[in-house]
């Protein structure tokens, strides 16, 4: 099964959307194998978003991500990366379809509630930034036999 990294950003936590987002993840047949709420350090935020370091919005992004608690998760399932990106919707909420997390809840491209890895390489890198291997669980959902061929 594929794993991906998902973060409910500080705006999602502050607006009480954590339970709604987790519910949507689980209803799609994905499972959460690691979960933590914490305030991400500046160093971790810079490492996580290092591909944006030269962009003008980088300082604001780091400031926002470190401004309050966020919820980090490792999500696992068949095509987990693609499925999570579909659950989240387009990065810019103006382009996000209704029924997606961002389409339903995001207010602005800079306050778009949630992050998910966009590739297997990004998922592996982001999971390693936020979790030790020993923090990632391994279990089977009782309905897995019905969910996957």
From Swiss-Prot:
Keywords assigned: ATP-binding, Cytoplasm, Kinase, Magnesium, Metal-binding, Nucleotide metabolism, Nucleotide-binding, Phosphoprotein, Transferase
Name this protein carries in UniProt: Nucleoside diphosphate kinase
Reaction equations catalysed: a 2'-deoxyribonucleoside 5'-diphosphate + ATP = a 2'-deoxyribonucleoside 5'-triphosphate + ADP; a ribonucleoside 5'-diphosphate + ATP = a ribonucleoside 5'-triphosphate + ADP
GO CC list: cytoplasm
Annotated organism of origin: Methanosarcina barkeri (strain Fusaro / DSM 804)
Entries under PANTHER family matching the protein: NUCLEOSIDE DIPHOSPHATE KINASE
This enzyme's EC code(s): 2.7.4.6
Active site: 115
Coiled coil: none
Encoding gene (name): ndk
One Pfam assignment: NDK
GO MF: ATP binding; metal ion binding; nucleoside diphosphate kinase activity
Family classification: Belongs to the NDK family.
InterPro entries: NDK-like_dom, NDK-like_dom_sf, Nucleoside_diP_kinase, Nucleoside_diP_kinase_AS
Binding-site list for ATP: 9, 57, 85, 91, 102, 112
């Amino acid at each position: 099964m594929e794993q991906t990294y998902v973060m409910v950003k500080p705006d999602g936590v502050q607006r009480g959307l954590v339970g709604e987002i987790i519910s949507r993840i689980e209803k799609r047949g994905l499972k959460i194998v690691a979960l933590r709420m914490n305030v991400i350090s500046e160093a971790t935020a810079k490492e996580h978003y290092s591909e944006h370091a030269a962009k003008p919005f980088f300082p604001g992004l780091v400031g926002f991500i470190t401004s309050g608690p966020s919820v980090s998760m490792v999500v696992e399932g068949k095509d987990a990366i693609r499925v999570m990106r579909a659950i989240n919707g387009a990065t810019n909420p103006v382009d996000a379809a209704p029924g997606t997390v961002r389409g339903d809840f995001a207010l602005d491209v800079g306050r778009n509630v949630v992050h998910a890895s966009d590739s297997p390489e990004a998922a592996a890198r982001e999971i390693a930034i936020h979790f030790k291997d020993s923090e990632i669980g391994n279990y089977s959902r009782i309905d897995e036999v019905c969910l996957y061929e």
